[in-house]
Amino acid sequence: MRKVAIIGAGAAGMTAAITAASNGAEVVVLEHMDRVGKKILSTGNGRCNFTNTYQDRSCYHSDNESFPWKIIEKFNAEQIIKLFEELGVYAKNRNGYMYPYSDQASSVTEALKMELERLQIDVRLQTECTDIFPRKKGFTLQIVKDGKKGKIYADHVILCTGSRAFPASGSDGSGYDLAKKLGHKIIPVLPALVQLRCEEKFFKSIAGVRVQGTVSIWSENQCLAKDTGELQLTNYGISGIPVFQVSRYAAI
């Protein structure tokens, strides 16, 4: 039996673990936080839009336009929806965004967690992978738990650590270092799907208000991007799907 070590127990890590175990692999999942799927709970404003039905090349912005399609053609929205139905999570379509019927991100987290348990996958919480060493056959992973060092041997390693976008959820950038040690090149990253801060001081007095509107990004009297939908006013500025859609232009 092939052994697969997965670093990170977010949405990608748990899905990879379930897929590998369902295909006969022995799986161990290493997660340095105290629970799995922590960042999932924040997605979609706590409702978790886990896929979308509109997937077109114009939606993906990259110097390598074909890159996303290598993945999407193998695992598309229909397959994602089917996967969650098999786990007991049925989807509702809201303008192309697919949410769990409960409108609770915790439904997604719990479904994935229960499937890990059903498949008896070895999930090790508060366990950090500090280094990976390739061997002639497989890999040696150096781990630390409660200050004690250890080693794990695996035939395959799947790195699912995420970026450094949300350290409080576990996405602290530690995966970049592991990737570099394995010879991968890290492309400089910029915020691409984030809230926007505003200079005006009145936002604190209207924090929590939701309103339908249009948000636009301007530079040198030129509109770079705009989008319409539900805006969420926060104590620091604006959030919501339209803001996320245009935020990458602010980062650039």
Where are the predicted features?
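N-terminal Rossmann-like FAD-binding beta1-loop-alpha1 element of flavoenzymes
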Residues: R2-V29
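Short beta-strand to alpha-helix junction loop
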Residues: P68-N76, N95-M114, F166-S171, K201
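Glycine-rich FAD pyrophosphate-binding loop
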Residues: A21-N45
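Predominantly flavin-linked oxidoreductase catalytic cores and closely associated redox partners
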Residues: M114-I252
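Redox-cofactor binding/interface segments in oxidoreductases and associated redox assembly factors
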Residues: I7, S42, L159-C160
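Glycine-rich active-site loop/strand segments that organize a redox cofactor
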Residues: N45-N95
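Mobile, glycine/GP-rich and aromatic-enriched active-site lid/loop segments adjacent to catalytic centers
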Residues: E86-M114, R118, K226, I241-F244
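Residue-level detector of alpha-helix initiation sites
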Residues: I6, G10-A11, R35, S163-A165
